[in-house]
């Protein structure tokens, strides 16, 4: 984090490259950096190929939103304070801008991503559909803790049936 509270893109990307190489060396078939740093997919792809891991695939978290749906997880692991006053909104996606999502996904594909993630999934099914239709790459949606918490609260209140809603929510 710099003095203005921003995550340092280039330094973070260097760490992500080291992590991806470590996973590939350990035998991972797919690496999936859970971040939104600019240029990280190209750097990871280059490092993997230079190290001979030409078959290691990359799942890019291309559309990772600055979402309140992460709240229960961040509270559970105490990660809200990790940024020391920083804000993930300065590098995660604006929920109101679907065109930015398509642009970011396209950049990651051009840099070498084999598949992409939209996170969280449920509130952004419009993004999932556009990515799949317009960019035609394997597309995954991530159900985060806030989505689970909504379902669990409704189940506990008797508004939804647990098995049915869990199965329905995973059909994306």
Predicted regions and their residues:
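Alpha/beta enzyme core
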Residues: 1-172
